[in-house]
Curated annotation (Swiss-Prot):
Note: An analog without the N-terminal PCA residue was synthesized and found to exhibit greater activity (144%) than the parent neuropeptide. The portion of the sequence of LPK most critical for the myotropic properties is limited to the pentapeptide fragment FTPRL.
Entry function: Mediates visceral muscle contractile activity (myotropic activity).
Name of this chain's protein: Leukopyrokinin
Gene Ontology CC, one term: extracellular region
Organism this protein belongs to: Rhyparobia maderae
Lineage: Eukaryota, Metazoa, Ecdysozoa, Arthropoda, Hexapoda
Length: 8
């Protein structure tokens, strides 16, 4: 599972 979650 590859999930990209951008964090500020």
């Amino acid at each position: 599972q590859t999930s990209f979650t951008p964090r500020l």
